[in-house]
């Protein structure tokens, strides 16, 4: 999601990435723990409670207010609305599916992103990418098929469709970020998304919000706080290590979701779900490693061309 700077400390970057996916999994568990709270309301708490943490971080980094200046409010608004829809669908799906299954379906995001980047940014689809995409899509189908086999009117099928829709919209949001990365700072992307998602969540008020009890309020506030921390940890990890180095460690969230789902929600992952998740994870890792290889080759070609001009 964020453009990487030259790697300075891969070990620290990996540690921060593992920390980020851990707190994001905890955030999802907090949202799942309040099934009576509408998804839009949960999104509001997730977004607004993260804002103070993000603002403190921006000030500490010396990126406030200069770092949030933007050349295109419209692009941030579009990206923010798409990302907000992805968040809302994901939160809604958590009510109907086990936490490990939601996590596994979300891993489809980089797979879908390859397809969207080819359609929207004109990126070439080579054989390795096509094979990885096909593998990932088969994995997703294996995960959601048991839910869909009961019919689309089943709540679990609805949950699977919601989470898959969330993954697709998250991929679309990342394509927008990729297109903006040349002109917008990471600080601007983080800040404007948090602001947009906070405002977008208010549009769901007419559809019915509830007054949370103290326990629910604690989980909602906690989701926002750890979500803000996760965003900072994620951003910081990409500043310290290359995306290709960090990518495999994002899948640690699968381990945490299985552990938390079993201990907290009495959820036991099925063999088809684990097999499908393995295929999706394999596809994601192959895609990222291939991207890294292509990036290295492009850098090498630029160096050769530069030497030829000397």
What is each model feature region?
Residues 39-52, 92-110, 155-169, 213-227, ...:
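Structural signature of hydrophobic alpha-helical transmembrane segments
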């Amino acid at each position: 999601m964020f453009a990487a700077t030259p790697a300075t400390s891969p070990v620290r970057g990996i540690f921060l990435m593992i920390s980020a996916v851990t707190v994001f999994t905890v955030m999802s568990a907090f949202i799942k723990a309040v099934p009576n709270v509408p998804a839009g309301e949960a999104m509001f708490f997730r977004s607004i409670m993260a804002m103070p943490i993000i603002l403190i971080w921006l000030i500490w980094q010396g990126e406030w207010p200069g770092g949030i200046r933007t050349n295109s409010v419209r692009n941030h608004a579009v990206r923010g609305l798409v990302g907000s829809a992805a968040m809302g669908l994901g939160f809604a799906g958590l009510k109907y599916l086990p936490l490990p299954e939601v996590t596994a379906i979300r891993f489809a995001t980089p797979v879908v992103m390859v397809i969207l980047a080819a359609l929207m940014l004109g990126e070439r689809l080579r054989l390795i990418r096509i094979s990885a995409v096909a593998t990932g899509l088969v994995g997703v189908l294996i995960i959601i098929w048991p839910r869909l086999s009961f019919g689309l009117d089943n709540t679990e099928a609805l949950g699977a469709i919601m989470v898959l829709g969330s993954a697709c919209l998250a991929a679309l949001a990342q394509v927008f970020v990729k297109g903006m990365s040349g002109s917008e700072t990471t600080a601007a992307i983080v800040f404007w998304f948090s602001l947009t998602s906070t405002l977008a969540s208010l549009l769901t008020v007419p559809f019915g919000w509830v007054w949370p009890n103290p326990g629910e309020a604690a989980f909602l506030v906690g989701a926002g706080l750890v979500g803000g921390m996760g965003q900072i940890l994620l951003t910081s990890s990409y500043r310290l290590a290359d995306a290709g180095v960090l990518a495999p460690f994002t899948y640690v969230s699968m381990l945490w979701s299985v552990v938390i789902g079993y201990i907290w929600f009495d959820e036991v992952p099925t063999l088809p779900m684990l097999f499908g998740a393995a295929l999706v994870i394999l596809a994601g890792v192959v895609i990222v490693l291939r991207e890294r290889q292509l990036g290295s080759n492009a850098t090498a070609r630029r160096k050769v061309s530069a030497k030829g001009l000397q």
